[in-house]
UniProtKB/Swiss-Prot annotation:
Listed InterPro entries: 4pyrrol_synth_GluAld_NH2Trfase, Aminotrans_3, Aminotrans_3_PPA_site, PyrdxlP-dep_Trfase, PyrdxlP-dep_Trfase_major, PyrdxlP-dep_Trfase_small
Gene from which this protein is expressed: hemL
Pfam families: Aminotran_3
Protein's recorded name: Glutamate-1-semialdehyde 2,1-aminomutase
Similarity field: Belongs to the class-III pyridoxal-phosphate-dependent aminotransferase family. HemL subfamily.
Taxonomy, superkingdom: Bacteria
Organism: Francisella tularensis subsp. novicida (strain U112)
EC id: 5.4.3.8
HAMAP family to which the protein is assigned, alphabetical: HemL_aminotrans_3
């Protein structure tokens, strides 16, 4: 694509007024070695159009929410009707009740739910609630699992599974993260070791049931069921962070696929239909501790605002129609199968996998197991960057990081998928010349 000048100009201007020129670091494209990101002018269906009028097949979908595609007619109509009645009330509204009822109907282990404004707020609030409910302070998270930018989550593993968390962002005091313990995803022994050392101090385990912030890593060997058992044995809570996987890999989230019951679940992305939203919910006994029903404080000026609630209601109505996830999953499977076949044809070290409307791309042989954050770091990250650049220049917009999952929408056509596969095939053949 030749037309890049307006994005370059805007990025230079943005850096004068916005730190780094973006409002979320990954958008800068630095992690994939690009000089500037593409500034988007508008979006429709499966496509993004940038300020230079380049068209892209979009496999980010605003990082997951756009499961129906951009500017779905029914969602837009619902929002437009609500806009005429007000943007935000700072008071309860019927839409909050309707969306809560729909979530509880569809998610197997949520009895009550509280709305917030982002996934970070949801996970932060769930941790506070778990600590209050158990009367304990320590939490366990997993290396490579991202739960938002609250201080207690910005932790690296240190040396060894038993190391206390050390902050990996300036501005996070060590005292804030001293109660954050870090284990290795899919390594149940690292969890057992932490409980042996801190048995009566651990309030909860928080985990992405499918790790979508280290590409797309699935739980192995009944890992989630084993976490459930350990939490039960030690009177700790199990929190599933389904901000990404909720209503994305299946209608009932990853917990419905693996049939493991968390005590609390965090949600976001899809439940807002593209509007800013988050939620946390779970057993009524626990949720009744949240203010004003109980003593655990949580509040938000725009929480439960009618615009986000309306978008969420319409989105969940549409994705809960019979056959929706069969069709969505078939699209993702066609993409993944085509990419894998193309790589195999050229004996290229690459494999892809998917579940529901979510997929992962790995630049290594399919004979190499990628089950942990460390495993992912051993894949060919440089080759991913080259692949990203080639696909972007040819009109395919992938996540600008080898550590991020991709998303497909119901709006993606067979032609979109076939074009993507064809371009990947060209890349694989070119790299072997």
């Amino acid at each position: 694509m030749e037309n890049k000048s307006n994005s370059q100009i805007l990025f230079a201007e943005a850096q004068q007024y916005i730190p780094g020129g973006v409002n979320s670091p990954v958008r800068a494209f630095k992690s994939v070695g690009q000089e500037f990101p593409r500034f988007i002018k508008f979006a429709k269906g499966a496509y993004l159009y940038d300020v230079d009028w380049n068209k892209y097949i979009d496999y980010i979908g605003s990082w997951g929410p756009m499961i129906l595609g951009h500017c779905d007619d029914d969602v837009l109509e619902a929002i437009q009707c609500q806009v005429k009645n007000g943007l935000s009330y700072g008071a309860p509204c019927k839409q909050e009740v309707d969306l809560a009822k729909k979530i509880i109907e569809l998610m197997p282990n949520i009895e009550q739910v509280r709305f917030v404004n982002s996934g970070t707020e949801a996970t932060m609030s769930a941790i506070r609630l778990a600590r209050a409910y158990t009367g304990r302070n320590k939490i366990i998270k997993f290396e490579g699992c991202y739960h938002g930018h609250a201080d207690e989550f910005l932790v690296a593993a240190g040396s060894g599974a038993l190391s206390l968390g050390q902050p990996n962002s300036p501005g996070v005091p060590e005292d804030v993260v001293k109660d954050t313990l870090v284990a290795s995803f899919n390594d149940i022994e690292s969890i057992q070791a932490l409980f042996e050392k801190y048995k009566d101090e651990i309030a909860c385990i928080i985990v992405e049931p499918i790790a979508g912030n280290m590409n797309m890593i699935f739980p192995q060997d009944n890992f989630l069921a084993k976490l459930r058992a350990i939490c039960d044995q030690n009177s700790s809570l199990l929190i599933f962070d389904e901000v990404m996987t909720g209503f994305r890999v299946a209608l009932g989230g990853a917990q419905s696929i693996y049939n493991v019951k968390p005590d609390l679940t965090t949600l976001g992305k899809v439940i807002g239909g593209g509007m800013p939203v988050g939620a946390f919910g779970g057993r009524k006994e626990i949720m009744q501790k949240v203010s004003p029903a109980g003593p655990v404080y949580q509040a938000g000026t725009l929480s439960g605002n009618p615009i986000a609630m309306t978008a969420g209601i319409k989105t969940l109505e549409k994705i809960s129609q019979p056959g929706f996830f069969d069709e969505l999953g078939a699209k993702a499977q066609k993409l993944v199968d085509g990419l894998n076949e193309a790589a195999k044809a050229y004996d290229f070290n690459f494999h892809a996998k998917c579940l529901g409307g979510m997929f992962g791309l790995f630049f290594c042989s399919d004979k190499i197991a990628v089950n942990t954050f460390v495993d992912l770091g051993k894949t060919n990250l440089k080759m991913f960057n080259q692949f990203f650049a080639y696909m972007l220049d040819n009109g395919v917009y992938l996540a600008p990081s080898a550590y991020e999952a991709g998303f497909i929408s119901i709006a993606h056509s067979d032609e979109d998928i076939e074009k993507t596969i064809c371009l990947a095939k060209n890349f694989f053949s070119r790299e072997l010349d």
